[in-house]
Amino acid sequence: AMFSCQSPKSNSAKEETAGIDSMAPNPFITHMYTADPSAHVWADGRLYVYASHDIDPPRGCDLMDRYHVFSTDDMVNWTDHGEILNSSQVPWGRKEGGFMWAPDCAYKDGTYYFYFPHPSDTKWNNSWKIGVATSKEPAANFTVQGYIEGMDPMIDPCVFVDDDGQAYIYNGGGGICKGGKLKDNMIELDGTMRTMEGLVDFHEATWIHKHNGKYYLSYSDNHDDGEKHNRMCYAISDSPLGPWEYKGIYMEPTDSYTNHGSIVEFKGQWYSFYHNSALSGQDWLRSICVDKLYYNPDGTIKMVKQTK
């Protein structure tokens, strides 16, 4: 199922010549409900977003049951590559299905590794595993390979491959964030996971990126004033596994009960991906969005302006 959503304003010659300065309006995916965007730029030069899927009509987060991949080469025209995985394809997964929550993807030596949280038992909350599916393509033909042994039953996998080829995996939930090294096969831990130190008010949604030789761990906090919820925060370290120095908030709450995002550089511009409920007005029918992200000279992140 190929689907391209084009911003109507991009039809003018002026917008076309603006190139990367023009972006599709938010939310940039409007034909289905999406959340938890993990964005990566792969060797083909396109930017890919791996997202979870909210089922309409909403039934909370228990029925999130499949993953789609979206890609762009200009931040204006987006392609839906269709579904790459659902719970019925997970041999070790809970028989009732559902619970396919925020994913991530990594690339190493010709293979794409798709990481997803899924419970193995009817009693889902304490049986979370981080599953791995592999493909030779970034957005199709993924096959489940099992799950990573030795990780706590938490959610929100994030995999970061450093410049030297060493891969790190993170997961979290319930106010705890853990990280560790992966072996070269990308599906086994190299050693044990350890708690990430120095984070303030960590809730969930770990994301790692590197900028000017420093490592950034971003996440959602526990902010709740009754109307506004998760803010996006970040911390900086000289090492992928910390200790981390908390630097503050880079995104204020959206209109959604949750937030979950990623930070990526594409064609010389940094971007912040996140989700809101602008399309539906309902907490569990979310939509992925993106806005430009800027750094201060000292490496701190400026507050991201959420646009429509």
Give the label of every model feature segment.
Residues 5-308:
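Carbohydrate-active catalytic/glycan-binding domains of CAZyme proteins
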Residues 1-3:
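Sec-dependent bacterial lipoprotein signal peptides
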